[in-house]
Structure formats: structure tokens, C-alpha cells
UniProtKB/Swiss-Prot annotation:
Protein name in the entry: Phospho-N-acetylmuramoyl-pentapeptide-transferase
Main localization (coarse): membrane
EC number: 2.7.8.13
Pfam families: Glycos_transf_4, MraY_sig1
Alphabetical UniProt keywords: Cell cycle, Cell division, Cell membrane, Cell shape, Cell wall biogenesis/degradation, Magnesium, Membrane, Metal-binding, Peptidoglycan synthesis, Transferase, Transmembrane, Transmembrane helix
Pathway(s) of this molecule: Cell wall biogenesis; peptidoglycan biosynthesis
Family affiliation: Belongs to the glycosyltransferase 4 family. MraY subfamily.
Transmembrane segments: 3-23, 54-74, 76-96, 118-138, 161-181, 197-217, 238-258, 262-282, 287-307, 341-361
Record's bilayer topology term: Multi-pass membrane protein
Location(s), subcellular: Cell membrane
Length: 366
């Protein structure tokens, strides 16, 4: 528990103090967000607001994770693990993609940033590398960071995407990992359209997973094989990483809350999406994440529905997509939308954690 608290605190401090440095840097160089003329008129006031604040979030996560693990090694109570490093690598890889996108927008005056092909290839390569590596590095019990089984609260034994380790099965598993990584990174990216919405929602999700992974650590099959134990590798280190994600997003939210002094940009949203995706895979809770991250699911689903219906029927389901802009178009104030969406996110998190704990109670009583 001490490691988790240290990680969250360090991440918060790094993020909250580094963010204003970035605000001054980008403001002094007149590097800010471009706002589309065809968008909501109320958003035009945001033109010129500094972006790339995700740098502070990533820095907070990295510094906190590294500091906490070095401290644990000095004290002889833990250290870096394969699972944690792989998720951190996924986070940094997607963050680098987002950084390149933001850099091109700001410094090369190309409003669209990376072209779609370059972004797709980058996400695909990063996801495939992650998917391959999470099946490597077995520990002394033969447990790898992830398994080829689809998972809800734990692995579903009857659904093996790897088909017993066949070449076809591994391809199917890698495709699945790409879908998970792409979906979550794009979902967080799409949600980042209102001041504080993506940062706050991610903080709720990371808070939930800090608890979940710590519970997996306390009830790990590595320490005691009993009813309800979890076959998750390195759960304590994953909890440390989740706490870093929680602290870093809260520190950034201090400056990103309405009226935002800075945006996280693709640097932050893609990185956080990678963190969400990676944690769901290595904690073996991919389907549970759909409940806990339900607001992200709603946001990306609204875009898919809008595009699908418009292309097939020539009609729009929403006034604007993603759905948070729909409510703005109906006349809701931005802060009203954000707070109400936060409430939805909190209810989803509570529901997901409740399902997770209920499963453990049921198995523990058997």
C-alpha cells in the first residue's frame, strides 16, 4: 500500500507543477490549439489555448513509476516487473504517436497532423509488438503477463482466442489486441473534447483499477491457491502504475478544468488510451473494462453510430458527434455536460468494481 501511495503522490506533484511550465512555454511561443470554424461557436474562444499537456501526464506517470520501483528495490520489497514495463511501453509508444501528431499541427502548421495512414500504421505496429510481448516472459510458475483467453473478471477458460497456440490462433489474438488498443486509445481521444472530461474520466478509471489490481495482489494464486484467487502476474506493480496514472491525471486536471488553461492533446489522450488498454489486458479484465470505462464506450459508439447511419441512410442521429457535442448543441453549458458525464463515469466505475467484488465474494463462499 505504501508503494501505491508514493506512486500516486509523486505523479500528482510532477504533473501539477510541470503543467504550468508547459502553459508558459507554449503561450510565450504562441503555439495553441486550432478550432474549426464549422464546429460549435462557443468553442471558438478556446482558439490559441496551449496543447500537448499530455507531456506532463506522461512525465508524471514515468517519474512516479520509476521512483517508486527504485525505492522499493532499495528497501528490498519489490521492483520493476515485466507486466508493468510492457504497459508503460504501450503508453509511451502511443504517447509518442500523439506527440508526433501534435508536433506536426503546432510546429509545421498542418492542422490535421499525422495523416490517417501514418497514425494507423503506428498504432498497428505498437499494438502488435505489445501483443507479442505479453505472451512472453513466463515467471517461475509459467505465468505470462497475459493469456490468449478472453477475460471478464478473470480468464474465461472456454474462450481461447489463441486456439491452443496455433499460428492461426496467435494471429487472431494479435488482431484482438490491436482492436483493444485502437478502440481504447481512440475512445479516450474522442472523449477529449470538453474541458476536463477525458482527464477526469480517466482518473476515475485509474482509481478503480488501482483498487482492483491491489485486490488481485492481496488474493493472488501465487501466494495462496484458494477459492477466488487471481492468476494475474505482477498485480502490485500494476497497482503502482495505475496509481501513477491516477495521480498524473488529477494533477493535470487542476489546470485542464473549465476554463482549461491547457489541453492534453493527442499526446495525452492516446497515451492514456494505451494505459487503459494495457491494464485491461494484463489484469485479465478486458470485458470488465467495458463496464468501468463505459463513458469512453458511449463516446466512441456515438461516433460510430453517427457515421454508420449517415452513410447508409443519409441522416444524422445526433446533432453533432461525439455525443458530448450533441448536448452542447441542445443548449447545455459545457460544464454541465462535463459534470453530468463525470457522474455517468462514476456510476459505471462503481458498477464495475461492484461486479468485480461480487465475483470474488461468490467464489470465496463456495
Amino acid at each position: 500500500m505504501q508503494q501505491i501511495m508514493v506512486s500516486g503522490t509523486v505523479a500528482f506533484l510532477v504533473s501539477i507543477f510541470l503543467t504550468p511550465v508547459l502553459i508558459r512555454y507554449f503561450t510565450n511561443r504562441q503555439l495553441g490549439q486550432e478550432i474549426r470554424e464549422e464546429g460549435l461557436q462557443s468553442h471558438l474562444r478556446k482558439r490559441g489555448t496551449p496543447t500537448m499537456g499530455g507531456i506532463a501526464i506522461i512525465a508524471g506517470i514515468v517519474v512516479a513509476y520509476v521512483f517508486t520501483n527504485i525505492l522499493a528495490m532499495i528497501q528490498g520489497v519489490g521492483g520493476f516487473t515485466v507486466s508493468g514495463l510492457l504497459v508503460l511501453g504501450l503508453t509511451l509508444g502511443l504517447g509518442a504517436t500523439g506527440f508526433a501528431d501534435d508536433f506536426i499541427k503546432l510546429y509545421m502548421n498542418r492542422n490535421l497532423g499525422l495523416n490517417k495512414t501514418a497514425k494507423l500504421v503506428s498504432q498497428l505496429a505498437i499494438a502488435l509488438i505489445f501483443g507479442f510481448l505479453v505472451l512472453q516472459f513466463p515467471d517461475e510458475n509459467g505465468l505470462t503477463p497475459a493469456s490468449t483467453h478472453l477475460s471478464f473478471i478473470r480468464d474465461i477458460d472456454t474462450i481461447d482466442l489463441g486456439f491452443g497456440g496455433s499460428v492461426f490462433g496467435i494471429i487472431v489474438f494479435l488482431i484482438f489486441i490491436y482492436v483493444v488498443v485502437s478502440a481504447w486509445s481512440n475512445a479516450v481521444n474522442i472523449t477529449d473534447g470538453l474541458d476536463g472530461l477525458a482527464a477526469g474520466t480517466t482518473a476515475f478509471v485509474m482509481g478503480a483499477y488501482t483498487l482492483i489490481t491491489f485486490w488481485q495482489f492481496r488474493n493472488s494464486c501465487d501466494t495462496a491457491v484458494e477459492a477466488g484467487c487471481y492468476t494475474v502476474r505482477d498485480p502490485l506493480d500494476l497497482s503502482v502504475l495505475c496509481a501513477a496514472g491516477l495521480g498524473a491525471t488529477l494533477g493535470f486536471l487542476w489546470w485542464n478544468a473549465a476554463p482549461a488553461k491547457i489541453f492534453m492533446g493527442d499526446t495525452g489522450s492516446l497515451a492514456l488510451g494505451g494505459l487503459v488498454a494495457g491494464i485491461s489486458v494484463v489484469s485479465r479484465t478486458e470485458l470488465l473494462m467495458v463496464i468501468i470505462g463505459a463513458l469512453f464506450v458511449i463516446e466512441i459508439a456515438s461516433v460510430a453510430i453517427q457515421i454508420g447511419v449517415f452513410k447508409t441512410r443519409g441522416k444524422r442521429v445526433f446533432k453533432m458527434a461525439p455525443i458530448h457535442h450533441h448536448f452542447e448543441a441542445l443548449g447545455w453549458a459545457e460544464t454541465t455536460v462535463t459534470i453530468r458525464f463525470w457522474l455517468i463515469a462514476i456510476m459505471a466505475v462503481l458498477a464495475g468494481v461492484g461486479v468485480f467484488y461480487s465475483d470474488w465474494l461468490h467464489l470465496a463462499e463456495v
